[in-house]
């Protein structure tokens, strides 16, 4: 993300809100942002929970010249309905695009890893990536819950790893881990994130950092496919 604010005719920007805090005259809650969060579980239209701090909207850039700040949109989604092709054609086209997307993101001179939750999105990405780079160069990472088995989906992640023959590193996440790490999670998030998944992702990321520098995930699948 790109966060920015203007204080006493000075334009500040950073990739994290915490980097802007020392330059704020008064740290206050943005009530409109808070209303958005409580209603939609996120802030709308570039608002944040900090008064005076904004987030650059997607597909926009900022132009600053002679003290004037302008916002410009450089990309827009256009939907063109195609009734001339079959469902099979679109399925094949989508498969090709997904493979190309993963192929584009594994261009690295270090071994690749993948977050494997056991769900569809991360499983597809990790399966394709492991096939592209070779199972010896790929590794999966997942969390499991031995104490709360009703929430544990590590068996699905293991099934994927077995099918594609890549190693799967697992971390058993406990309530003690939550107690010891929740402050770090809050610090790195800057703003609250609806849902408990960010904590689990933090723990799995700590595990992955010991083995890989580049790790792919399945985030964004719901937004793209309407899941």
What is each stretch, according to the model?
Residues 1-189, 201:
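Cysteine-centered catalytic environments shared across enzyme families
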Residues 193-200:
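Catalytic subdomain that performs nucleotidyl-dependent activation
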Residues 203-227:
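Active-site adenylate/phosphate-handling loop in enzymes that bind or generate adenylated species
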């Amino acid at each position: 993300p790109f966060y920015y604010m203007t204080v006493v005719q000075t334009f500040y920007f950073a990739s994290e809100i915490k980097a802007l805090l020392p330059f704020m005259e008064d740290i206050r809650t943005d009530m409109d942002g808070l209303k958005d969060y409580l209603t939609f579980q996120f802030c709308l239209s570039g608002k944040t929970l900090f008064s005076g701090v904004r987030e650059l909207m997607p597909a926009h850039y900022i132009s600053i010249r002679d003290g004037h700040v302008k916002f410009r949109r450089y990309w827009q989604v256009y939907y063109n309905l195609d009734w001339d092709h079959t469902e099979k054609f679109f399925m094949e086209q989508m498969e090709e695009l997904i493979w190309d997307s993963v192929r584009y993101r594994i261009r690295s001179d270090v071994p690749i890893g993948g977050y494997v939750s056991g769900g569809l999105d991360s499983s597809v990405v990790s399966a394709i990536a492991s096939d592209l780079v070779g199972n010896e160069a790929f590794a999966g990472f997942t969390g499991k819950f031995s104490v709360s088995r009703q929430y544990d989906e590590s068996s699905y992640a293991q099934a994927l790893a077995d099918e594609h023959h890549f190693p799967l590193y697992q971390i058993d996440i406990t309530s003690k881990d939550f107690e010891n790490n929740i402050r770090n999670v809050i610090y790195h998030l800057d703003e609250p994130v609806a849902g408990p998944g960010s904590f689990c992702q933090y723990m799995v990321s700590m595990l992955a950092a010991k083995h890989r520098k580049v790790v792919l995930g399945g985030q964004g699948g719901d937004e793209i496919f309407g899941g």
